[in-house]
């Protein structure tokens, strides 16, 4: 049921098209059918994901635009991660939703290749911008004096977007509009070698999931160690401050006290941002693990239940990661959304006040005009009456 997959590449289509292009073994005589009940579930799930991703990330971008702290490095990375999640919603979830509604891809070959290319761009961008944000937090905690400057941040984000555009290029060559049955065309993958689907999906799994997760684990391992070390220093500083003066009178006591006081302790704000990025990473792992597990299973096991409902629905849930991130931002940076709500309420109040003033002014003009007209008409009537003398 190739049209029901929410993946950026169709595992079933890949398996079906493993033979050389033009081979007749991949075509069927009659028109393929699908489970309409399952298709309705897929459409409902994708509609919900699309609505949540669009509304949530649009609110994040609007909140970041209206906040007073526009030059925060964390907010800079949040902005680009929200843009990447919007790319996932618009160019991955929306095309798949339309595809599930129509069952077949209706469009030219160029559109087929473009859609499949943009679907993977969103995946790569969302993953590697999250990785870049985590590296930034790691540098901010472990080496605050060497943390990236604003210009370097922009260059790193630009390089990440360009790298994602390049890494997604194989999609253009793999997918094309081809005949899958007599007179039936669809946007399917074509692999020249039988091992092509295994190699390609394994590479995507390594590039988008396994390698980033390893790097993220290393980053947060270093961050955890640094925070633990910092807590020890805070405890030592508190103990040194409470100790009697005579206890630190010796040279060793003075050296230890100087060492503790010279260490720059990590602020609570930095720890809060680390918690936020850690939860985002955890959501990334939870959302993507079932998807890649199912993808690898589908190409490495010939007996995988590719038509099972649970198997297909799991593939749809990968895009949930783009829905989760805005709620995580709201949890840890609630002031952003509070400012957005306040701005919205102020604008609404100003609009309603202006509208009431406009209506009042129009009403006064109307009353004044009616008074003048009635006064004139009464004057004319009094002048036109004949004299009784």
Swiss-Prot record:
The chain crosses the membrane at residues 39-63, 75-97, 114-135, 155-175, 203-225, 276-294, 310-332. Pfam families: 7tm_1. It is a multi-pass membrane protein. Glycans are attached at residues 8, 15, 26. Residues 7-31, 361-389 are annotated as: Disordered. It comes from the Eukaryota. GO terms for biological process: cell surface receptor signaling pathway; cellular response to hormone stimulus; female pregnancy; G protein-coupled receptor signaling pathway; lactation; maternal process involved in parturition; muscle contraction; positive regulation of blood pressure. GO terms for molecular function: oxytocin receptor activity; vasopressin receptor activity. The modification Phosphoserine is found at residues 366, 368. Keywords: Cell membrane, Disulfide bond, G-protein coupled receptor, Glycoprotein, Membrane, Phosphoprotein, Receptor, Transducer, Transmembrane, Transmembrane helix. Residues 64-74, 136-154, 226-275, 333-389 are cytoplasmic. Residues 7-26 have a biased composition (Low complexity). InterPro entries: GPCR_Rhodpsn (IPR000276), GPCR_Rhodpsn_7TM (IPR017452), Oxytocn_rcpt (IPR002062), Vasoprsn_rcpt (IPR001817). Disulfide bonds join 112-187. Its main location: membrane. SUPFAM superfamilies: Family A G protein-coupled receptor-like (SSF81321). One of its GO terms (cellular component) is plasma membrane. It is found in: Cell membrane. Residues 1-38, 98-113, 176-202, 295-309 are extracellular. Receptor for oxytocin. The activity of this receptor is mediated by G proteins which activate a phosphatidylinositol-calcium second messenger system. Belongs to the G-protein coupled receptor 1 family. Vasopressin/oxytocin receptor subfamily. This is Oxytocin receptor. It comes from Homo sapiens (Human).
């Amino acid at each position: 049921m190739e049209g029901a997959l929410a993946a950026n590449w169709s595992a079933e289509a890949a398996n079906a098209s493993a033979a050389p292009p033009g081979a007749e073994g991949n075509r069927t005589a009659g028109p393929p059918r699908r489970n309409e009940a399952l298709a309705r579930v897929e459409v409902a799930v994708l509609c919900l994901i699309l609505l949540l991703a669009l509304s949530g990330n649009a609110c994040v971008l609007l909140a970041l635009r209206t906040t007073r702290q526009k030059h925060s490095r964390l907010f800079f990375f949040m902005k680009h991660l929200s843009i990447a999640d919007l790319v996932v919603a618009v160019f991955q979830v929306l095309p798949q939703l339309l595809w599930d509604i129509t069952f077949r891809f209706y469009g030219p070959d160029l559109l087929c290749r473009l859609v499949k290319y943009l679907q993977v761009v969103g995946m790569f961008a969302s993953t590697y911008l999250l990785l870049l944000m985590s590296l930034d937090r790691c540098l901010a905690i472990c080496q605050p004096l060497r943390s990236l400057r604003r210009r370097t941040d922009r260059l790193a984000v630009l390089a990440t977007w360009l790298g994602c555009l390049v890494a997604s290029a194989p999609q253009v060559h793999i997918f094309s509009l081809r005949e899958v049955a007599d007179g039936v065309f669809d946007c399917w993958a074509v692999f020249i070698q039988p091992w092509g689907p295994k190699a390609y999906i394994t590479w995507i799994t390594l590039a988008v999931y396994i390698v980033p997760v390893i790097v993220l684990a290393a980053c947060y391992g270093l961050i955890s160690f640094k925070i633990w070390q910092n807590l020890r220093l805070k405890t030592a500083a508190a103990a040194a401050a409470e100790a009697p003066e005579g206890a630190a009178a010796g040279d060793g006591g003075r050296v230890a006290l100087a060492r503790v006081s010279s260490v720059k302790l990590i602020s609570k704000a930095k720890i809060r941002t680390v918690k936020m990025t850690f939860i985002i990473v955890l959501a990334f792992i939870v959302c993507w693990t079932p998807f890649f597990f199912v993808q690898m299973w589908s190409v490495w096991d010939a007996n995988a239940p590719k038509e099972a409902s649970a198997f297909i629905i799991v593939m749809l849930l990968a895009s949930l990661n783009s829905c989760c991130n805005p709620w995580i931002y709201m949890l840890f940076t609630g002031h952003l959304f509070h400012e957005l709500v306040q701005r919205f309420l102020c604008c609404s109040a100003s609009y309603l006040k202006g509208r009431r003033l406009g209506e009042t002014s129009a009403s006064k003009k109307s009353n004044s005009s009616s008074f003048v007209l009635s006064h004139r008409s009464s004057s004319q009537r009094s002048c036109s009456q004949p004299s009784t003398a």
